[in-house]
A protein has these predicted regions:
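Acidic-enriched and Gly/Ser
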Residues: 2-185
Length: 185
């Protein structure tokens, strides 16, 4: 159990017999009233966001999570297959658990998967991923860095805005947090 004032974004807590991931936390002490912690959190089972106000004295149960490094192998349309890099055991996950992470998954990508009581609950991607451009308008010769961008479809189906000098077949580095172009890879 931890104090509500110790909550931080990214932590997973058990609240009302459900697992929640802390999205945003703000500690407030208005005037001469008792302090409280305003928390915005995401229910891991359904993905719904809720807000809750904890008293500064409240105690919250932090979920004991196990983290394993896994390597993405392939998908068959329904399941996404991963291999544990320590013991080579394979497992599959559904798109419900992976969420938007599927837009960045390419074979041999190493990710961290968090488990609670033996069940996978979330996937942590690396900060950036190198992906190949499969469809975009032809590049403009002599184009340099500017505010002008064009859409580019990547090998995973993700569409990002790229500078005009990027062509089909090129590898680019994409931020997994924002889903945006970073640089050529």
């Amino acid at each position: 159990m931890i104090s509500a004032t110790q909550l931080r974004p990214g932590m997973v807590i058990k609240f009302n017999n459900e697992l929640y991931s802390i999205f945003k936390m703000e500690h407030r002490t208005p005037g001469n009233l008792r302090g409280f912690v305003q928390v915005k959190m995401r229910k891991l089972s359904s993905g719904t966001m809720i807000e809750h106000r904890f008293s500064s004295e409240d105690r919250v149960e932090r979920a004991a999570l196990e983290e394993h490094e896994m390597e993405y192998l392939y998908d068959d349309g329904e399941y996404f297959y991963f291999m544990n890099t320590e013991n080579y055991e394979q497992m599959h996950l559904t798109k419900d658990i992976l969420g938007d992470s599927v837009e960045f998954l390419i074979p041999q990508l190493k990710v961290n998967i968090e488990f609670y009581e033996g069940k996978p609950i979330s996937v942590e991607l690396p900060p950036t991923v190198d992906l190949t451009v499969v469809e975009t308008e032809p590049g403009i010769k002599g184009a340099s860095v500017s505010n002008v961008t064009k859409p580019a479809k990547l090998e995973t189906g993700l569409v990002v805005q790229v500078p005009p000098f990027i062509n089909e077949g090129e590898k680019i580095r994409v931020s997994t947090a924002e889903g945006t172009y970073q640089e050529r890879a």
